[in-house]
A protein has these predicted regions:
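Extreme N-terminal leader/targeting segments of oxidoreductases
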Residues: 1-27, 44-45
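C-terminal helical "tail/cap" subdomain of flavin- and related membrane-associated enzymes
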Residues: 5-13, 331-399
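Conserved N-terminal helical subregion
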Residues: 16-22, 75, 79, 85-191, ...
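N-terminal Rossmann-like FAD-binding beta1-loop-alpha1 element of flavoenzymes
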Residues: 24-51
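Conserved Rossmann-like nucleotide-cofactor binding loop
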Residues: 34, 57, 185
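Glycine-rich FAD pyrophosphate-binding loop
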Residues: 43-65
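Conserved FAD-binding catalytic core of PHBH/FMO-like flavoproteins
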Residues: 77, 177-284
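FAD/FMN-dependent oxidoreductases across multiple families
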Residues: 252-342
Length: 400
């Protein structure tokens, strides 16, 4: 019997694991930091990628903004092979001072509070990093243009660099994956009929770059004030980025002040040891809201970054949350490229796995704003107690 036994018949291979596998294509709509990183991550997963944005490369670089990067973002960039390039322009901060000015409490976070995860690949250590928009986008665009698996269509003219779709094959063909990385107002999300929840804050946010005295060059500050959170982020060479949250009417008045009057107003908002010296750019105010798409996918469409969610800037969580979207999308794209997941299921798998992290982050930032902008006596007492306990607990500081 054994000699006549038939060999087991292998299960038929699904069609998506054969003829379509080498032709996996993605189209990314939106060329900002999240869209650019998405294109690079998908290309590294073996997909052919077309990146489309109505703005030109120079326009995409033109924003004056700074981002706080956490260790989760740094480790993801390392896996993509981008950290060595970006660390050249990322300013590390090795100390973070959290001050509750209403409760009269302050606590410091240093390298001991991040442990071994604070060690960068080049041997330097940091609590986090500050990365300005222009050098970030310059380097991401250079990587996009150099990648053979990526085609750029920026502005009104498609880029001749990147030969993946130069024959026009990505244009008329439907991609296996469509990624909306086109921001909070996302026309792609709206055209897909995906609604969102939106909760405007009573606060707005003002950003400016100033030169300060009294702060170490590698120290960041998170100040909790009665009118809202206030972050002071080091940019190197004595320059700092301010992220000032306050009622919109007040910020509108501050935005209209001349430089001398603005610095005088700024001095009253900062701790005494921080003395403003010079205003380096015109302050700009913008509204702040908590936003959450009601779903992160529809069919082969996946929403990433602010097309899917938006949180208050307190704690510098925004960019890190967006890039964790990219990391999860790449994880599912790798499964599809390996034949473990139908390409048509990538967006759905991504959407399911992102909900918990996004909801927790939005809840965390929202609670920070509501608790630390509240002068209710019981809450003030609780804040003092919480910060006192945290100051005495290394484990507590490590989990902030």
């Amino acid at each position: 019997m054994s000699a006549l036994a038939l060999a087991p018949v292998p299960a038929p291979t699904p069609s998506w694991r054969t003829d379509r596998l080498p032709q996996l294509r993605a189209r990314v709509l939106g060329g900002g930091p999240t869209g650019a990183l998405t294109a690079l991550a998908l290309a590294q997963a073996g997909w052919r990628v077309q990146l489309i944005d109505p703005l030109s490369g120079s326009q995409l670089q033109a924003r004056r903004r700074a981002y706080a990067l956490s260790h989760s973002s740094r480790m993801f960039l390392q896996r993509l092979g981008l950290w060595e390039l970006l660390s050249e322009v990322a300013v590390p901060f090795r100390s973070l001072r959290l001050c509750d000015l209403e409760a009269g409490r302050a606590i410091g976070f240093g390298l001991d509070d991040v442990g071994s995860c604070g060690t960068r690949a080049d041997g330097a250590e940091a609590v986090g990093w500050i990365l300005q928009h222009q050098p970030l986008m310059q380097r991401l665009l250079e990587q996009l243009e150099a990648h053979a698996g990526i085609s750029l269509s920026l502005g009104d003219v498609a880029s001749p660099g990147g030969n993946a779709e130069s024959s026009g094959s990505a244009g008329p063909q439907l991609p296996d994956l469509l990624v909306a990385a086109d921001g909070s107002a996302s026309p792609t999300r709206r055209s897909a009929g995906i609604r969102r929840w939106r909760l405007p804050y009573a606060q707005a946010c003002l950003t400016a770059q100033v030169r300060l005295r009294g702060s170490a060059p590698d120290q960041a500050w998170e100040l909790f004030r009665r009118e809202g959170p206030f972050a002071v982020l080091p940019l190197g060479d004595g320059t700092t980025q301010l992220v000032w949250s306050a009622p919109a009417e007040r910020l509108g008045r501050l935005e209209a002040l001349d430089p001398v009057a603005f610095l005088d107003a700024l001095a009253t908002a900062l701790p005494e040891r921080l003395q403003p010296e010079a205003l380096l750019e015109r302050p700009r105010a913008f509204p702040v809201a908590l936003e959450l798409a009601r779903r992160f996918h529809r069919g082969s469409l996946a929403l990433v970054g602010e097309a899917a969610h938006r949180c208050h800037p307190v704690g510098g969580q925004g960019m890190n949350l967006c890039w964790r979207d990219v990391e999860e999308l790449q994880r599912q794209a790798l499964r599809a490229a390996a034949g473990e997941l139908p390409p048509a299921a990538v967006a759905a798998a991504y959407g399911r796995r992102r909900w918990a992290d996004v909801l927790l982050t939005l809840l965390f930032t929202d609670l920070l704003v509501r608790i630390f902008s509240n002068r209710q006596p019981l809450l003030l007492s609780c804040r003092r107690l919480a910060l006192d306990l945290m100051a005495r607990s290394k484990i507590g500081r490590a989990h902030v």
